[in-house]
């Protein structure tokens, strides 16, 4: 897979911002079929940085229940917490 197919979009949230400042990690939504090695290579190719570690979280799809009835479906996703090498940063995330 090409790195444009692996990295879906960056995750910008309160937790992602906290992790970026404290642990020098950035968070991406990634393709559910991508593995850690492919994610590492994709981030290094796309942003020209050195990656030291990748942690992956997979959220399963679930039903949305309201008043005892199934109203809809919440889609699942896969998130990657990418740890950058000391001194590295992605300019895309600065100022967010």
UniProtKB/Swiss-Prot annotation:
Pfam families: Ribosomal_L23. The keyword Cell membrane does not apply. The keyword RNA-binding applies. GO terms for biological process: translation. Gene3D superfamilies: 3.30.70.330. GO terms for cellular component: ribonucleoprotein complex; ribosome. Part of the 50S ribosomal subunit. Contacts protein L29, and trigger factor when it is bound to the ribosome. This is Large ribosomal subunit protein uL23.
């Amino acid at each position: 897979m090409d790195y444009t197919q692996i990295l879906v979009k960056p995750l910008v949230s309160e937790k992602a911002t906290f992790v970026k400042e404290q642990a020098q990690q950035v968070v991406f939504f990634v393709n559910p079929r991508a593995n850690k090695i492919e994610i590492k290579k994709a981030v290094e190719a796309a942003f020209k940085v050195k990656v030291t570690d990748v942690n992956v979280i997979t959220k399963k799809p679930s039903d949305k229940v309201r008043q005892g009835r199934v109203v809809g479906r919440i889609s699942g996703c896969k998130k990657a917490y990418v740890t950058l090498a000391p001194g590295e940063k992605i300019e895309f995330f600065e100022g967010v």
